[in-house]
Each structure stands twice: as structure tokens, then as C-alpha cells.
Amino acid sequence: MSERLSPRRIPKGTDAAKLHKWAAIFLIAGIIGRAFLENALLGMNTMTSEELYAAVEADPDSMWILTAALACKVLQTCAAPLLAFLLVEGYQRTSSFEKYLVRIAGLALGTELPYNLAMEGKLLVLGSRNPVFALVLALVMLYFFSHFAGKGLKNTLIKVLIFAAAFLWCRMLRIEHGVCLVILVGIIWLARTRTNLRSLYGFCGTMACTLFDFYYIGACLSCIMFHRYNEEKGEQNRIFNYAFYPVVLLIVGIAAKFL
């Protein structure tokens, strides 16, 4: 008599793979909004705010494109809490911090030219850096946080200085979304042992981010997913996770040139 095979148990909630997929969707919305809607169709990367206002007045249909572009900006910010959360989870679960740091740093370097092409329409942009560089700084910040994990006054002051250093480096390097990503990583790190409060901490982090970028008012929506997180890795493809962002940027950047 053959044995009856019991069906594989599917964990309830949201695993890390699903968080990656949602982050990818939000990032795609942001890339399309800026590369196609803002730059290719409206030309916002080549005009001042006064010129944009005049262009919208001259062509009322442009208002619909502008509205869609702004909606994409809000959707893009929803990726930031998810990426910050995944970075904290990745740091806590990695078997080699050095290899993890090298992968993130490699992604930052590999993303720079495609990011410039998609966001600015040219390969070389000296005035800013892509957001992945903020994840590199945030990862180094977590490394030092864990080495001063005590609750005493001395350790607390050291962690404040470490956070301030990461914050200032993001400002000095002009990393896009850098300050907000560092804030979110720092706050989510505080909630690493308070699993029932992760969504609340994430919400507070996104509200703090609105001081630097008002579009983060919508990012709090993605923090709801933290509450459903089931601590499972899920079915992931590491190559996809790391190659997705620069590849999509490159494809969109090239396609936008033909619009």
C-alpha cells in the first residue's frame, strides 16, 4: 500500500521573497514615473518649475501626466521601508558580513550608470549618487550598532554618533533618498526584537522621512507588511534580487531615449 503524501505546509503571512517582489513593483513605478512621465514626456529634467507651470497651462492634458508622475513618486517611496527592513533582516541572518557588504557595494557601483541614464538621461552625473549607496552606509552603520549593543549611556551616545555620521555622509555624497533610508534602517533596527511593534516603528520612521521628502507620506502603507512578516525566507533567486534594479534601470533608460 502506498503512503499518502501530506501536502507541503505553506507558512501563513508574508515572507522575505514577497517583500522583495513588492519592493520591485514599487521601484518599477518610480522608475517609469521619472524616466518616462517626468523626463521623456514632460521634460522636467530640462526645465525650471516656472517653465513646467507654463507648459502645463499651455497644454491642460499635461496635468494628467504630471498627476500620474506624482503618484509614481509616492509609490516609489513605498519601496524604502521594505528595503530597509530587508537590509536589517539580511544583516541579522547573513553568515558573512564581509560578503554581504561586498554584494551591496557591488550593486551600488553597478547601478550608478544605469541609474543616471534612467533618471537624468545621461550616463555621467556628478551631482548625486544612486540610493543603493545609502544601503551600503546603512549596513556599515548596523555593523557598528551591533558592536555597541549595550543599553548604557556610553553605548547609546556612540550609536547616536554612528547614526549621525551615516546621515551626514548621505548628505555630503548627495545620495538620493539616502537620508530617508538611513533613518528607516536605524528605526527598524530598534524594532528588531519587538516584532509586534515593527509596523508602528516603520510608520514613525516614514513620518520622520516626510521632513526631508514629503512624498514619503505614502510610504507608511508598506509598513503594514511588517506585521504580516513570518520570518521565512521564501523562494528567492539571489541573482534576480541583485540584478533586477540595474537591469530595469538600463532597459527603461534606453527605452526613454526613443520617446
Residue ranges and their predicted role:
Residues 1-259:
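Alpha-helical transmembrane segments and their immediate juxtamembrane cytosolic regions
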